[in-house]
A protein has these predicted regions:
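Active-site rim elements
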Residues: 2-4, 63-69, 151-152, 219-225, ...
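Rossmann-like flavin
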Residues: 1-53
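Residues forming the flavin
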Residues: 69, 75-82, 96-98, 113, ...
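Helical element adjacent to the flavin cofactor pocket in flavoenzyme catalytic cores
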Residues: 51-126
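Amphipathic alpha-helical segments that form well-ordered structural scaffolds
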Residues: 12-16, 31, 75-83, 233-240, ...
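Generic structural signal for well-ordered, non-membrane alpha-helical segments
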Residues: 6, 10, 25, 69, ...
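Conserved flavin/dinucleotide-binding core of flavoenzymes
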Residues: 173-354
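Mid-domain catalytic core of redox enzymes
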Residues: 93-223, 228, 232, 236-242
Length: 354
């Protein structure tokens, strides 16, 4: 769907699998919840096929995760901010962008500074909206030059989530680093942090303990339950998967996340915002943006960010940052893919002649 620009509009995974055998349907329900954070009836078929194709079918090595050595702040955000300061840039915390206004020399960005309780603005020749879909929609609907068009655009849904971490005074028997839950569980996927992140690895070496991070992707009504209920059910799910850990828990925390987790789908051409928007000098990036790359999630956010930065560099006649192409499919998968593409092209040509 991403390569061919096929939105499969109005179709959801639930429509596709409703008549499948129960066991096979259960597998796809688990995949939908764990990788696109939604139940099949809420998962756009285009997004699911895009995920399945790139992350499971074309290359076996795509099944393996790559992990940051530390938390996201230490590994990614703090180095980026440091580099920004090093280059003369600045950040403003506690501020909410309210709208944009087009002026002769660029875009005036308006925001509310909650710490000073003041409205402020700044003029920029180019602007990149590096925000989630729902906040991009709010900003563009509130901006005079973009509001009319924004009302008719395709905006992917975003879901609230919860992250739970549990600490144990012993390790699980299974030598695994990550996996998914399926069946009658509230949890969706898990990661054993003492096998992945430096701080937890050091703690494990010192204590012999283990720590797991589990994600809860909804439904929204589940996430509204009291924290004590969510923690109790999460511990029960982990104990069910790793019974040797029962009665060995020593600490637990839960974090609720705002509804910014994208349920990706491919919107109709001209209605799904791309990196280059219909408005001059205004660009978008994020995991929800339409772009030819087959990658999703954090990878998509990074790729579209580089593409948006390149658009600004182009406007200033500066060298571009190279974008790495996705790895090619393995031989058998590539052969099947070429056959399918050839067949679809032939079918479209036949339909056009009728």
């Amino acid at each position: 769907p991403l390569y061919e620009g096929q939105p499969l509009e109005g179709l959801h995974l639930g429509d596709f699998i409703k008549n499948w055998p129960p066991a096979l349907r259960a597998i796809f329900i688990g995949l939908s919840r764990n990788f696109l954070s939604a139940h099949p009836q809420e998962t756009p078929l285009s997004g699911f096929i895009g995920f399945l194709r790139f992350y499971m079918l074309l290359r076996r090595d795509a099944w393996a995760f790559s992990y940051m050595p530390d938390d996201g702040g230490t590994s990614l955000i703090e180095p980026l901010v440091h580099k920004l300061y090093e280059k003369g840039g600045a950040t403003a915390l506690g501020c909410t962008v309210t709208h944009l206004r087009r002026e002769a020399e660029g875009w005036r960005v308006h925001w509310h500074d909650t710490q000073a309780n003041q409205d402020r603005s700044a003029l920029a020749r180019q602007v990149i909206l590096a925000v989630d879909a729902s906040n991009a929609e709010k900003i563009l609907r509130a901006s005079p030059e973009t509001s009319a068009s924004a009302a008719g655009l395709y905006w992917p849904r975003a879901m609230p989530t919860a992250v739970i971490r549990l600490w144990f005074n012993r390790t699980p028997d299974a030598d695994v680093e990550a996996g998914i839950f399926s069946g009658e569980c509230i949890l969706d996927n898990y990661f054993w942090l003492h096998r992945l992140q430096n701080a937890y690895i050091e703690w494990h070496r010192a204590t012999g303990g283990a720590a797991i991070e589990v994600h809860v992707y909804g439904p929204p009504e589940l996430l509204q339950a009291p924290d004590a209920v969510l923690l109790s059910r999460a511990i029960n799910d982990v104990n069910g998967a790793f019974p040797e850990l029962r009665n060995h828990i020593i600490h637990q925390v839960i974090q609720h996340n705002d509804p910014t987790h994208t349920v990706f789908g491919v919107g109709p051409a001209g209605q799904h915002l791309e990196v280059t928007t219909p408005w001059p000098d205004l660009f978008c990036c994020g995991d929800w943006v339409r772009y030819p790359s087959p990658a999703l999630f954090l990878e998509r956010a990074c790729i579209t960010s580089i593409a948006a930065a390149n658009a600004v560099l182009t406007a200033h006649d500066l060298p571009l940052w190279p974008l790495l192409p996705p790895p090619p499919p393995e031989r058998l998968a590539g052969w099947i893919q070429r056959l399918m593409l050839r067949g679809r092209r032939a079918r479209r040509q036949r339909d056009a002649r009728r």
